[in-house]
């Protein structure tokens, strides 16, 4: 008994007949049609033209993915059998090393930002080629391209569930993409407009109902995802706002600017809570310290009073080649660490709370021990400027991006960096 429905059998028979006609095997095709009582005539625009070949290629591709999945499953089973407790400890303290596992190539211009999906093995990359590309970091394969922006894309961020992806661009717009509609032809997401210059960063706030954006128009804006309305404009910076990030509970919003300052705001009122001055050049990047790092920071600064309030400490990186750690509530500079030889473009706290990682245009990633401020390791993994870092979800893969136009993926933990082309002007 055939496992195919009548319609499936008819499609299969016609596809075979079309293939035979295309190979100039007319007599065999006619004989087949007669034997199967098949009423079919080959036509140039027939929907069956090339269908058999496409199905064959799809089967081969699926077989390859199945084999890769089986191999990964076998490797994971062996790793689990080798000692899960020991591996968990190793994962907590893992630090990035060269070389990367994958080189992902497809973008036609410098890559500007990368973001990990919170659940699936997906990596989004934004580029000056006006597109966002989605990759499977586990296999190193390209998934799809998102088109909709008309100029350089500078920021990309997933919400906490991975249901939406936000992007921002020099075309003055922010776009919110429903991940369930990626495959729909012509889909270009919802557009949020209001900024008057390049939008440099976009971030979902905790709860995923609001988005914060930073712009060269010197403002930070808060947007409702559902309505696409701008509900608040925060002003105060005197120059380009390079980045904005929320605290883990969403009660604070940090920003850094070309005016050489970093600031912390109340996102519900737009009131500035603290200003941080001390850098001698543009402040490129800001990051809130996670609760896991508080003990190490207190040891670093000699602080006795303990706090568990989210957003108690921040780190900033500047074109003055230094990283500074600050007490948010007092505004006190706790420590300055130096070692990079060029602009600092990326900062990320290690999930264990023991380290802070920085990326620089000097082509290195440095690992700093938070409790002492000492540089523990220098990763010389790139040949061009490194301009951002992102740490992905637990039990994930490492992704770094090196340009021209190539992201790298490694193992076994998620960290992402991107590098601008050597000849690309530094804004």
UniProtKB/Swiss-Prot annotation:
Residues 58-82 form a coiled coil. PROSITE patterns: LISH, WD_REPEATS_1, WD_REPEATS_2, WD_REPEATS_REGION. Self-associates. Interacts with NDL1 and dynein. Dimerization mediated by the LisH domain may be required to activate dynein. InterPro entries: Dynein_regulator_LIS1, G-protein_beta_WD-40_rep, LIS1_N, LisH, PAC1-like_LisH-like_dom, WD40/YVTN_repeat-like_dom_sf, WD40_repeat_CS, WD40_repeat_dom_sf. One of its GO terms (molecular function) is dynein complex binding. Positively regulates the activity of the minus-end directed microtubule motor protein dynein. May enhance dynein-mediated microtubule sliding by targeting dynein to the microtubule plus end. Required for nuclear migration during vegetative growth as well as development. Required for retrograde early endosome (EE) transport from the hyphal tip. Required for localization of dynein to the mitotic spindle poles. Recruits additional proteins to the dynein complex at SPBs. Keywords: Cell cycle, Cell division, Coiled coil, Cytoplasm, Cytoskeleton, Microtubule, Mitosis, Repeat, Transport, WD repeat. WD repeats lie at residues 106-147, 149-187, 194-233, 236-275, 278-336, 339-378, 381-420. GO terms for biological process: cell division; establishment of mitotic spindle orientation; microtubule sliding. It is found in: Cytoplasm, Cytoskeleton; Cytoplasm, Cytoskeleton, Spindle pole. It comes from Postia placenta (strain ATCC 44394 / Madison 698-R). Belongs to the WD repeat LIS1/nudF family. It holds the Pfam family LisH_PAC1. Residues 8-40 form the LisH domain. Gene3D superfamilies: 1.20.960.30, YVTN repeat-like/Quinoprotein amine dehydrogenase. GO terms for cellular component: cytoplasm; microtubule; microtubule associated complex; spindle pole. This is Nuclear distribution protein PAC1-2.
């Amino acid at each position: 008994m055939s496992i195919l429905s009548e319609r499936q059998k008819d499609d299969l028979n016609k596809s075979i007949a079309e293939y035979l006609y295309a190979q100039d095997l007319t007599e065999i095709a006619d004989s087949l049609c007669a034997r199967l009582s098949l009423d079919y005539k080959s036509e140039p625009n027939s929907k069956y033209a090339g269908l058999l070949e496409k199905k064959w290629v799809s089967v081969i591709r699926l077989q390859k993915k199945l084999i890769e999945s089986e191999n990964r499953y076998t490797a994971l089973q062996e790793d689990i059998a080798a000692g899960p407790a020991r591996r968990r400890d190793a994962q907590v303290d893992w630090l990035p090393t060269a070389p990367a596992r994958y080189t992902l190539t497809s973008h036609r211009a410098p890559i500007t930002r990368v973001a990990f999906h919170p659940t699936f093995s997906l990596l989004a990359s934004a580029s000056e080629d006006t597109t966002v590309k989605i990759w499977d970091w586990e296999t190193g394969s390209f998934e799809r391209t998102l088109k909709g922006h008309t100029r350089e894309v500078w920021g990309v961020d997933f919400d906490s569930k991975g249901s939406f992806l936000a992007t921002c661009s020099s075309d003055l717009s922010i776009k919110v993409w429903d991940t369930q509609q990626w495959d729909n032809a012509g889909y270009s997401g919802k557009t949020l407009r209001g900024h008057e210059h390049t939008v440099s960063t976009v971030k979902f706030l905790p709860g995923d109902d609001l988005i914060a954006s930073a712009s060269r128009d010197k403002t930070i804006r808060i947007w409702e995802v559902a309505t696409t309305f701008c509900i608040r404009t925060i002003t105060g910076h005197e120059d380009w706002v390079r980045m904005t990030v929320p605290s883990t509970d969403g009660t604070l919003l940090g920003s850094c600017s070309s005016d050489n300052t970093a600031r912390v705001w109340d996102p519900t009122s737009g009131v500035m809570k603290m200003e941080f001055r001390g850098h001698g050049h543009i402040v490129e990047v800001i990051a809130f310290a996670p609760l896991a790092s508080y003990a190490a920071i207190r040891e670093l600064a000699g602080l006795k009073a303990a706090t568990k309030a989210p957003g108690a400490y921040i780190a900033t990186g500047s074109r003055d080649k230094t990283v500074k750690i600050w007490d948010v509530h007092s505004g006190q500079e706790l420590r300055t660490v130096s070692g990079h030889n060029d602009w600092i473009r990326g900062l990320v706290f290690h999930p264990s709370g023991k380290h802070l990682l920085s990326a620089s245009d000097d082509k290195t990633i440095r690992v700093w021990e938070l409790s002492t401020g000492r540089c523990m390791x220098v990763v010389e993994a790139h040949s061009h400027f490194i301009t951002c870092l992102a740490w992905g979800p637990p039990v994930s893969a490492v992704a770094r991006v090196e340009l021209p136009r190539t992201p790298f993926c490694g193992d076994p933990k998620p960290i992402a960096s991107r590098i601008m082309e050597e000849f690309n002007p530094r804004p």
